[in-house]
């Protein structure tokens, strides 16, 4: 056993016997890991000797190593000035002179008291060995050893130093002489000692005889191989009995035992932490005091260790003595060169036990291991943030200090860290030494290359425990975790806004400062970021050095060329496992995958809405804050995003840099070009899980999903209306503000959006780029083409949940829903009238404004809306592009054709809930409903009369103006309405396309056919609420209602007679003018009304269209049929209020009422019989009144 008296008799073991020596040149050849290993071994050896009581006192070399100093970092003059106990050249050879006997006694008192040796039983509390009952023989043997050790002392003549061995003394003497007898044959280097020469030879030995079977790595020495093998093995045979900890080597266990056994007598008063050595305590205290005694003379920066200062000085000197033979790159440290060499060899000897991942450096493995643990022992006193590493805490503290010591000499920009300055310098030099073998992309740093390689390998070692998402980098995982925790450690001092990343805070601060440090000398334009400056430089530079060999196209950037090459290769390396779709880039695949997962990790705290990307969430938040930091210098308009400002500027410049290869059309935005390209392809990769509908774009699918969700997050503060999208809310707000910033230079019309202006301009240019492949019809917009295609396919994707009705447009569904809800959110500020749609309100406002901006160049007529002008122009052009396949009838509008088709199909999809009546058009149903509600929203400002339809009001206004703009070219007759002119023209053509299936009669108008059909069916849908009488026409009901009200608004200017309807007044006027425009072709007789001519014609034809269903009798007029039917029913609907007698005809009732109005009959008879003049008078009255009733 070591430490027994027997072992001491064999001779004193000294620290010199177990010390390893290196010359300054050899020390510099060691890398950091080897230097650290040397320190650990030296300290371990000393502790073992001290534990056994053999080390008399601490050597100066151990003191240096404990303080973290390098053996060769002290200057020559500093060493000479030391006390005489130290040799300035080779301090490791010496032991300071002291009382060796006294030292041994101290060892005995301190160590053997705890040892429990049977021969050295010391009583506790004894001050010296003599006071204790010690076995005399054992103590004498110790004294003999002491004497033996003292006899082996050799002294240096120059520095009066003491040696315990002649070998050490002889070696020390050779060093003073400076004689170097051992010369290297490979180089000019020579050495004092043969051992140093042998060690030096290892540099030139190419063969490495010791090979590791695990990883095939080779080594010069078997001892190095043995140490290396421990990396691969998990075996730890040496276990500590005190704490249970296991070790691979016995020496490590021995060192560990000292830690367990040795009392930590050096305690820190600040935090209570205890240490084995006073030197360790001294270093530790600097954490609390912040003491940095080692100062750099160049820049004034101070350090806590001299070794750190020595490394720092190389930044100023630029010294890089260690050069890589592979690539020629030089380094300031051998350890950095050793790490660098692994880039070329690909060696990764350090493996993680947790996940099996291998690393090229032990430090990288140590950093990696932290990812598996959640412990964060290093806490910041400023903000309480905790860190896993001390180095990260140190870097973090710079944020609070705001100190920027490292300044760029080129542009003057300062940085917190030297590494950031080094990275920054590459901007000026453009150096990128690390190149990817896969794609040829170059990088400034090897670490950047390593990160880049993961894109090709798809390796994602860092996984989130919360959601399972994996990342390429630990830093990305750290940032991702903040999504779950909600942590925002970086706070803006200006506005208090907090951020998850320091980089985002830095960018945010620029909003407050407005600083643009990166300026381009060519045009003087300044930028906030260096990246933006680099991109801008390409605009000025015409150079395109990267050329495609396939097509000859040149590019400014190599990455763009790489992306371009994929077009020729057709290669899509990144495939989706869900749907099989392939992509050119991994980023595109990642974006695509979210479609399948539907994951939305980023949630808005204000409204709860979730987003796929953090950037989208940031943009969304500006809706709540209203922040718009980007302002246009031309018009002053502000935007929330720089990209939106860039797009906006193109309105002023007219720039359209993005061109379509298919059709040559140019666009101002790349996104618009991308959307345009879809018009050339039929692919629809995005499918809705709810209704199986497919879409060309992900954004359209996202918008579509809102229909199913019914969610309306965006609410208007003015009127409370909610919307599915923020864009819809923005559009809605213009109703309240009335703002229209985009004006048409052609006609002066203003619009809310630039896109609306662009659409409007096509009216002037008549451009129609979107063509239907089915029928060849062209459209201004792709959306119009999409809707048009549904005519051919019959597709109706938008279904009403209330009644099940389907629609081809979402807007039509939205309008339809208001039938069920009755909601009218759009209110006119002028008159208080409410509307279901914003478009209806916009049209309504024109009534108050009275403004007519759109003027016809042909006839000078002006209109409120451009659509009305467009409709009007067709009168002059007579163009009717929409033709019916059934009857060949042509129409101006496709919508009119659609309505017309329902005549042939008899489709009536719109049903009235009150009476069950169905209509082919929703507008007809809306008009019909007003019969039940009595609503008359359209009021005449002249006479105050109200109407249920705007068209009726328009027609009514002509009464006051007398205007008749629509003139017949055949006969010169003018009309107030275009529809009346159309009806009139049929008189000249004789065309009757509408035929009755019951009797075969044909009509020139569909409305006439509808009225005629009611003769056969007997349908009378229009009922009077006053008396219950029903009518087959709404006009008859309107006329009838006037009986109850007594109102006669239409007055004849000639005789003052008033009439219920305008048509009756027109008929009456012909009495004064004697005009008879309707002439019979058979006999030449003329009539003042067309209806009278129709009835007259039946005299020639003998036609009796009105047939009785009971007896088959036919009549020329409907009124005659109505009277006849009463014979069969026996119905007597007309009752006398005076006597209660009922009649089957209203005319008989009218005659009957006269009985009650005349003088009583009997007294009149008496007076008539009496004779005389009075009797003759009474006789006349009876003859004229009573007798016709009696006979």
Swiss-Prot record:
GO terms for cellular component: nucleus. It is found in: Nucleus. Its main location: nucleus. A zinc finger (C2H2-type) spans 154-176, 179-200, 208-232, 238-260, 266-288, 294-316, 322-344, 350-372, 378-400, 406-428, 434-456, 462-484, 490-512, 518-540, 546-568, 574-596, 602-624, 630-652, 658-680, 686-708, 714-736, 742-764, 770-792, 798-820, 826-848, 854-876, 885-904, 910-932, 938-960, 966-988, 994-1016, 1022-1044, 1050-1072, 1078-1100, 1106-1128, 1134-1156. GO terms for molecular function: DNA binding; DNA-binding transcription factor activity; DNA-binding transcription repressor activity, RNA polymerase II-specific; zinc ion binding. Keywords: DNA-binding, Metal-binding, Nucleus, Repeat, Repressor, Transcription, Transcription regulation, Zinc, Zinc-finger. Residues 13-84 form the KRAB domain. It comes from the Eukaryota. InterPro entries: KRAB, KRAB_dom_sf, Znf_C2H2_sf, Znf_C2H2_type. GO terms for biological process: regulation of transcription by RNA polymerase II; transposable element silencing. Transcription factor specifically required to repress SINE-VNTR-Alu (SVA) retrotransposons: recognizes and binds SVA sequences and represses their expression by recruiting a repressive complex containing TRIM28/KAP1. May also bind the promoter of the FCGR2B gene, leading to repress its expression; however, additional evidence is required to confirm this result in vivo. ZNF91 is only present in primates and emerged in the last common ancestor of humans and Old-World monkeys. It underwent structural changes between 8-12 Million years ago, probably to improve the protein's ability to bind and repress SINE-VNTR-Alu (SVA) retrotransposons elements. Belongs to the krueppel C2H2-type zinc-finger protein family. PANTHER family: C2H2-TYPE DOMAIN-CONTAINING PROTEIN-RELATED, ZINC FINGER AND SCAN DOMAIN-CONTAINING. This is Zinc finger protein 91.
